[in-house]
Amino acid sequence: MRVAIPLTGTRGDVQPAVALGLELVGRGHEVVVGAPPNLVGFVERAGLKAQTCGPDVQQLYSSEAGQRALAAGSSFRLMRLVGEQMAEYADRMNREVIEVCEGAEVIVSTMLTEDRAHPVATAMGVPLVSMHGFPCRSNGAYPFPGALPPHWSPPAMVNRASWALAENLRRLVFARYLNRLRRELGLPPTMASTAAQMARDGVPEVQIYDPALVPGLPQQWGSRRPFVGFLPLERAAREAVGELATEHADVVSWLEADEPPVYFGFGSMPIRDTGAVLGMVERVCAQLGVRGLVSAGWSDLDVADARTDSRVKVVVGPLAHDLVFPRCAAAVHHGGIGTTFESLRAGLATLVCSVSFDQPMWGGQVERLGVGAHVSFARLTEDLLTEGARRILRPEVGQRAREFATRLQSHADATVRTADIVEKTAARA
C-alpha cells in the first residue's frame, strides 16, 4: 500500500509523522513524506523517502515579522502571519501536496496540512487519516488555544464560542486559497470549514497526546478521535538524525558530576539578546543555588555567546530528552507537546514559558494539574523566571509530578496503534 504523508511546520510537527511512517514501512508499505525544505534531510536521515512540501516555517519564525508575532504571544497574530505567507506560497504548496499524494492509496495529514489533504483525498477517492497534536476541535472542556488566558476556567458555552470564533476566522483567511485548490482538483467551491467536511466524511482524527493531560475531553469525543499518546522516534532513527550523537556522552558526564540541574530548553523562543538570556539563566541558577543545562534548540541562541560559569552548560543541536530529563531536577521550556510529554514522563515539575499556538494551553494544563507552572514568554522577566523555577523546585510539586508520570499511558504502542488505524481505514475504503 502506498501511503502519502504531506507535512509542514517545525520539527515538532514533523517528527511524530516520521515515527508513523517508519512503522508503516516496517509493515511492508511504501511511504512518501512531504516535508518543509529545511526538514527534508531530517526525514531522509531517519530512513524515509521525502519530497519538498510547504515553506520553511523556521525561516518565517526567525524573520523580523515572525519574531515580533512570537514575542507578542498572540495565536491570532500568528494565524494572520501564516495566512500572509500562504498568500505568497499557496499555489506552490497546492502543487506540492498534490505531487506528494500522487498514486497514494491512503493519505495521512496533520492539523497543519489537512486543509489541503482533505480535498486532495476527496478528488482522488482515497481515505484520509489526520493526526492532531493538541485539541483542535470544538469542545466544552477547553477553549481554543491562546483565545483566553490559560488560567481561566470558563463555562462550556464560552469554550465552544471561542472555537466557533477561531474556526470562522481560519475559514475566512484560508477559503480563497483552498477553493483555488478545489477548482484545480475539479471540486466545487465550499465555504464549509475543513473540520465540518471531515466530520461529514467520518475522517479519523487521531489524538497523538496523552488523555491524562486533558481531563474530561476524551469523554466528550467519540471513537472517531481516539487518544493514542505521543509518537516517539525509535532508537535507530534517533541515532541516524544525530539525537544520540557522541556529544551526549559529554552532557551525561556533566549531568552526573554534581547534583541534578534545572533544564532550560529554548526551542523556538524568540530570543533577541542571547547574552541577556544566558545572563538571566545564570543569575536565576545562582540565586536558587542550582546548576542549569541550557538547550538552544533552533532558536537564535549562539553557543559562541555562552560566557557561562561551570554551573551552567549550553548545548546546541538535537538533544535526547529521555537521556537528559531523568538526570534533571526540573524543567523549563516553551511547552511544545513533545517536550512537555517528555518532561512530565520523566516525572519533572515543569515551568512552561509559552510562546503561542498550543503552548499556552499546555502551560495552563501543567499548572492546573499541579505539576508545574506557566508564564507567557512575552511577559518573562528575571523575577518571574526565578519565581517559577523556585515553585517547580518545591518538594511537593516534584512529588505530584512524579505521581502524575505514573498516570501517563505507555507511549510504546502509540505508533503501533496509529498505524493500525491507518491500515483499517484503508481497508474499509
Mark where each language-model region is.
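Short gly/pro/ser/thr-enriched loop/turn and capping motifs at secondary-structure boundaries
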Residues: 39-41, 57-61, 130, 134-141, ...
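Short loop/helix-cap segments at secondary-structure boundaries that form the rim of catalytic
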Residues: 39-46, 118-123, 141, 214-223, ...
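Phosphate/nucleotide-donor binding subsite
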Residues: 49-106, 160-164, 172, 176-178
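A short helix->loop->beta-strand "cap" motif at the edges of active sites that frequently abuts
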Residues: 48, 124-127, 203, 290, ...
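Conserved nucleotide-sugar donor-interacting segment of glycosyltransferase catalytic cores
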Residues: 88-159, 211-214
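Generic beta-sheet signal
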Residues: 34-36, 53, 110, 131-134, ...
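Donor-nucleotide binding loops and adjacent catalytic segments primarily
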Residues: 209-330
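Nucleotide-activated sugar donor-binding and catalytic core shared by glycosyltransferases
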Residues: 1-32, 38-46, 158-172, 176-185, ...
